[in-house]
């Protein structure tokens, strides 16, 4: 972290980004390196990232994350990757994953039910420390406490506000469904006609918005890091997005009002075609 006497806001708003550290009188070599390598190339490959080395992992692991954790995808990747690619049979067959309705750096996760703007109810409360103690007792002390007889995956289903257990991820019963973005006059803001449904588009015009770097769309909640007490950190967790969705430089695509429950659990992939002037 930078010393408090440094005016962080000046660095945050400075353009171009590659010069932001210099704007506050600092020289941060790795920052320049990161900006100069925006895509995956040999610079990143030489760091031997874990997702290219799952075959070398030799230890069992209990991985936990939150649905609003900035490192959620890494946790999922590690569970799936080690289970699938580890050459060590002990590691390969002894991975567990826990995902709850949490954010990153929340402290004792599982001890509160309110995250962001939503109260996930009493079912969200869980004794994670006890789970960790049982894990360590089994693997470090050899105490057969039954933890390895339990399902490998435990996730909290938000909305239903209940826990679900499985031995694999993605869940076996997952029904992959394609949704498509549509608009007629334009999807700009809540007042636009952006639509999300399962019908493929047909000869539709592209949506256009104007981006002003001096008036950016500010992050409201989501998978952010790390603490709201930090003046310069974004808010965390699920938040009402209508403030941002009222802006003309935000495209909004919504489904019609649902007439039945729809659960969204599993990996999501977006294919988008875009260009910039």
State where each predicted segment sits.
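Accessory cap/linker subdomain of secreted extracellular hydrolases
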Residues: 1-56
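C-terminal, loop-rich substrate-recognition/catalytic regions characterized by aromatic stacking residues
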Residues: 11-18, 107, 112-277
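Catalytic cores of eukaryotic secretory-pathway lumenal/extracellular enzymes that build
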Residues: 46-47, 91-122
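Extracellular/periplasmic catalytic domains that process cell-envelope and extracellular macromolecules
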Residues: 54-57, 89-92, 170-173
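Short beta-strand/loop motif that positions the catalytic acidic residue
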Residues: 57, 63-65
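Acidic catalytic loop of the alpha/beta-hydrolase fold
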Residues: 67-72
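Active-site-adjacent alpha-helix of alpha/beta-hydrolase-fold enzymes
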Residues: 73-95
